[in-house]
Amino acid sequence: MLKILQARLQQYMKRELPDVQAGFRKGRGTRDQIANIGWITKEARVFQKNIYLCFIDYARAFHCVDHNKLWKILKEMGIPYHLTCLSRNLYAGLEATVRTGHAITGCFQIAKGIHQGCILSPCLFNLYAEYIMRNAGLEETQAGIKIAGRNINNLRYADDTTLMAES
């Protein structure tokens, strides 16, 4: 069942995610983004451009995904309701307790975090992170480094983001 849901979500990922996001996508890897950054810095030297790169790694990225926000994002991105419901059902009613010394706390609801190791988690995280980037105010036409007639202001691999700008 999860494989079918993953295949459906990946169809929407292909549509929604820009080519600057290489994480969790078939045929792409960290080496691609490292090579892109290397090429960009080399070209900047050739054309004597000052560029600035800011490397960001989300700490505990999968743990920070808010469930309610995720369902809203999936809806906004046009993910069909039935796919969102199936995903939501995986997280419905999750509870946990914590052992503190010799005692155990009472049960509490888990409202954040996507499952580590679940085949759906990379898709869900990519869509969540894409929403953040779309709403970060980084308009491609206004900022970034001009490459082949296009401004590129970020490169991403899963939870690693490189922001780029010229001086």
Q: Predicted regions: what is each one?
A:
Residues 1-167:
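Nucleotidyl polymerases of mobile genetic elements and RNA viruses
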